[in-house]
Amino acid sequence: MAATSSISSSLSLNAKPNKLSNNNNNNKPHRFLRNPFLNPSSSSFSPLPASISSSSSSPSFPLRVSNPLTLLAADNDDYDEKPREECGVVGIYGDSEASRLCYLALHALQHRGQEGAGIVTVSKDKVLQTITGVGLVSEVFSESKLDQLPGDIAIGHVRYSTAGSSMLKNVQPFVAGYRFGSVGVAHNGNLVNYTKLRADLEENGSIFNTSSDTEVVLHLIAISKARPFFMRIVDACEKLQGAYSMVFVTEDKLVAVRDPHGFRPLVMGRRSNGAVVFASETCALDLIEATYEREVYPGEVLVVDKDGVKCQCLMPHPEPKQCIFEHIYFSLPNSIVFGRSVYESRHVFGEILATESPVDCDVVIAVPDSGVVAALGYAAKAGVAFQQGLIRSHYVGRTFIEPSQKIRDFGVKLKLSPVRGVLEGKRVVVVDDSIVRGTTSSKIVRLLREAGAKEVHMRIASPPIIASCYYGVDTPSSNELISNRMSVDEIRDYIGCDSLAFLSFETLKKHLGEDSRSFCYACFTGDYPVKPTEDKVKRGGDFIDDGLVGGIHNIEGGWVR
């Protein structure tokens, strides 16, 4: 996938609107002035006519551009089968190589977002500079681009967009310049009260140029009267409901915020030179040689500046509800998430499956890569050899273009190749982390049988998923989830395996012990800790840039033009 550098995700608050750049391939970062033009406060302006929001040089929003890239993965069930974590965030304070360390840390979080990346830094003259682009981290950034991001403070973001829409989207971090200072933000999560907040803001004069829930935060900061400046961030976050682990950068501070329920992970570490690092997972700390110190606690705001690290607390303080799927699927096995080893959790899930749902078999295999550790646990407990029966191609991304309906079934074969020598004539247990729609599972069973497997027994290292997620995970609507429509026996018949078993929900909670009350199980139970009162904010359509890049849009006292 070719990377497309972009500055169009950035929001500037200069009084005079900037025109859309005519050079979409400009590699220079956009610089946000420390002291932008004086502009009126949020209470001193009257609504602008609708016609002012667009001009001959600046298209109206939202854009609707016919883009051939909408064909990419649009109907690819093979890549829709898993729930998708949509973001990973990084923040670094106090290291002269902040942008390069951020780049490396984003590499470690690449599994959390593979379709876009961005970095914002603060230069010595207090200027916020940003480079964002479409593609993998290595495709977006080069040595020359990192040279354009000097400074000892940085935040970064990797993003997964939803399949079925253009993949040329603006990516975070977002940056906004206010008359009282500039701020950048990178967000992992999803706000369940986004629609209401946006409606209230628009009613009072704010104009949005994206449908991203993250933009709401920038508008709330714009209208906040809290002092000092970083307290505007705290004030804005206290109005949010749902999941958010965010890192903010101002002209002299790094701020990390985690929602009061702690849905999404956020950890803190420190490098040997004293630099403070925040990241979605500890694997990012490991890569840049930062020592893990602790989690950012649910409801905590950590402010880092030249005087050290200060703590604030958001109100109220509900019981934590951390996403259990971080341990089942999203996080890397070498990460410590919510104080627990992801590897150990998955290994135990496999052991539980072997104990509760045994079957006579000759070999245990995994659906790579997410099912490997659970399969190792199953094999160890069952006393059966684990072998690599499916080989995953790492060169087929989610951008695979399918020319016609007739060859759609080749999608799984491109991604997974069976090893006939392992499978032929064998009774096979295949372990996967989850079943969402069931489409990929049925194709995997068929692949194994075509390779000569005598029997195919599927073991799923999570309970059945019956409800959609509203807290930052891209899952289908509940009526698309196969476990919400079929019994286990019906699913077994649908995917064509000889037997099927899921991890028991009660046993999962028992394994978590005293911590079981601290996890969110909404996808397994339909019991939502924060009640969703509106439709999901679908990330696939949350940005206005369906194919055009290079736009710089302005906010004036809360208005976005």
Swiss-Prot record:
Record function comment: Catalyzes the first committed step of 'de novo purine biosynthesis from glutamine. Required for chloroplast biogenesis and cell division. Confers sensitivity to the phenyltriazole acetic acid compound [5-(4-chlorophenyl)-1-isopropyl-1H-[1,2,4]triazol-3-yl]-acetic acid (DAS734), a bleaching herbicide.
Keyword Iron-sulfur: yes
Positions that bind [4Fe-4S] cluster: 323, 469, 520, 523
Disruption phenotype: Strong growth retardation and severe chlorosis in leaves; white leaves, but green cotyledons. Leaves missing the palisade mesophyll layer, due to reduced cell number and size. Abnormal thylakoid membrane in chloroplasts, probably due to photo-oxidative damage. Defective in protein import into chloroplasts.
Family: In the C-terminal section; belongs to the purine/pyrimidine phosphoribosyltransferase family.
Gene name in the database record: ASE2
Annotated phenotype, changing residue 371 to S: Low resistance to the bleaching herbicides DAS073 and DAS734
GO annotation terms (biological process): 'de novo' IMP biosynthetic process; chloroplast organization; purine nucleobase biosynthetic process; purine nucleotide biosynthetic process
Note on cofactor: Binds 1 [4Fe-4S] cluster per subunit. Binds 1 Mg(2+) ion per subunit.
Cofactor needs: [4Fe-4S] cluster; Mg(2+)
HAMAP family: PurF (MF_01931)
Record GO terms (molecular function): amidophosphoribosyltransferase activity; iron-sulfur cluster binding; metal ion binding
Segment annotated as transit peptide: 1-53
Record-given protein name: Amidophosphoribosyltransferase 2, chloroplastic
Catalyzed chemical reaction(s): 5-phospho-beta-D-ribosylamine + L-glutamate + diphosphate = 5-phospho-alpha-D-ribose 1-diphosphate + L-glutamine + H2O
Upper taxonomic lineage: Eukaryota, Viridiplantae, Streptophyta, Embryophyta, Tracheophyta
Entry EC number(s): 2.4.2.14
Domain Glutamine amidotransferase type-2 stretches: 87-307
Record pathway: Purine metabolism; IMP biosynthesis via de novo pathway; N(1)-(5-phospho-D-ribosyl)glycinamide from 5-phospho-alpha-D-ribose 1-diphosphate: step 1/2
Organism: Arabidopsis thaliana
Stretch list, region Disordered: 1-36
Active site: 87
UniProtKB keywords: Chloroplast, Glutamine amidotransferase, Glycosyltransferase, Iron, Iron-sulfur, Magnesium, Metal-binding, Plastid, Purine biosynthesis, Transferase, Transit peptide
Effect recorded for residue 264 to K: Strong resistance to the bleaching herbicides DAS073 and DAS734
Source organism superkingdom: Eukaryota
Keyword Isomerase: no
